[in-house]
Amino acid sequence: MKFKNFLFAAGTIFLTSCTAMHNQQQVEEITDIIQQVNNQWQSTHPEHGRAFWDNAAYHTGNMEVYHLLNDTAALNYSREWAVYNDWKGAKSSNREEWKYSYGESDEYVLFGDYQVCFQVYADLYNIDSNHMPITAGEKSHPHAYKIARTIEVMEYEMSTPNNDYWWWSDGLYMVMPVMTKLYNITHNPLYLTKLYEYWSYANSIMYDTETGLYYRDAKYVYPKHKSVNGKKDFWARGDGWVLAAFAKVLADLPKDDIHRNEYLQFYQKQAAAVAACQQPEGYWTRSMLDAEHAPGPETSGTAFFTYGLLWGMNNGYLEVDSYRPVVEKAWKYLTTVALQPDGRIGYVQPIGEKAIPGQVVDQNSTSNFGVGAFLLAACEMVRFLQK
C-alpha cells in the first residue's frame, strides 16, 4: 500500500510538473504575441492622438502590458500621450459651457468619452508617485499635476445635482473605473457614493433584468427596438464595455464597500448570459442573441468578454470549470482568426453604437480600441496560466 501511495504521489508530482512546463511555454508564447501586437500598433502609430475614448481605450490595454511585463516602452508610450494631451481630456476651462451629451469638442468635459483617459493618468500617477495619496488641496508633491485636471473635473461633476452622466453602456467602462481609482488615491468617499448613484441611473434606463445584459442605450430597449428576427438586440461591444468595467471596478473597490455584493451579482449574472450566447467558433456576433442580424466574427466585443471572464476566474468570482471552455474557445478565435501574421488585430467593428446588418467587418478591420481590448484579454490569459 505504501508503495502504491508512493507511485500515486510521484505520478501526481510528474503530471503537475508537466502541466507547469506546458503552462510556462504557453505564457512565453502569449507574451510574444502581446509584444508583437503592441509593437505593431506603436510602430505604425508613432503620433500621439487626442485624449478621446478610442485612443484612451487602447492606452488602458497598453498600461496593462506595462503592469504585467514591466515594459518600459509601453509605459513611455502612454506617458508621452498623456504629456501630449496636457494630462487632460476635453480642455475647456469655462465650467459654464461644460457638457455631457455626445460631442467631441473641448466643451464636452463632462462626457465620459473624454474621461476614460483619466484611468490612464491615474495609473501613471500611481506609478510615478509610488502610490502617494492626495488629500484635499494637496498640490505640493511633484507628481500631483498629473491628475490635477482629473480630480478637478470629477469633483466638479460630483458637486452637481445631476445623476444621468452615464447614459450609454460604453460610459460604464469609460468612467466607473475612474471613480474607484480616484477613491484609492484621494480616499474621498464621495467617489464611491457617486459611483453607485450614477450606475443606478444607468441600470434604470438600459439594464435588462430578464437576461442580465445591457442595451447600448435607451434607444435600443426592447420592444421599442428589435433585431431583424424580432429579438432583443444587445450589442456585443456595448456589453463588452460593461463586463470589463465590472472587472476593473471590483479589482479596485474596497472589500467592505456596502455595494460590493450588488456589483458582484450583476457581474456574475452578466458573465453567465455572455457565456450562454457565445458562437461555436469562439466569437460573439455583434447582435448577441440574434446571430443572423449581423453574422460573422467581431473582435472588440469578444476580447472585452474574454478579459472580463478571465478576470473573474483569476480572482475566484467565476467557476473555472464552467468558464474555462468559454475562454479557451474565445482565445483560439482571438489568436487564430483575429490576430494577423504581421501583428494586426482584425475583425474589429468600426466606431459605432449598434450591430449593422450588411456592414463589412473583415481581417482588414482594425482600430485602436480593438487592440487595447485584445491586450487586456491577453494579459489576463497570462495571469490565468501563471496561476
Map each language-model feature to its residues:
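Bacterial Sec-dependent N-terminal signal peptides
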Residues: 1-25
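Acidic-glycine-rich active-site phosphate/pyrophosphate-binding loop
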Residues: 29-36, 84, 90-91, 145-156, ...
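His/Met- and acidic-residue-enriched segments that coordinate or traffic transition-metal cofactors
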Residues: 32-50, 60, 89, 101, ...
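A broadly conserved amphipathic alpha-helix scaffold signal in soluble, globular proteins
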Residues: 119-125, 142-145, 149-152, 173-184, ...
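Asp-box/WD-like beta-propeller blade repeats and closely related beta-sheet repeat scaffolds
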Residues: 134-176
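Extended ligand-binding clefts on enzyme/binding-domain cores
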Residues: 169-170, 180-288, 295-306, 318-350, ...
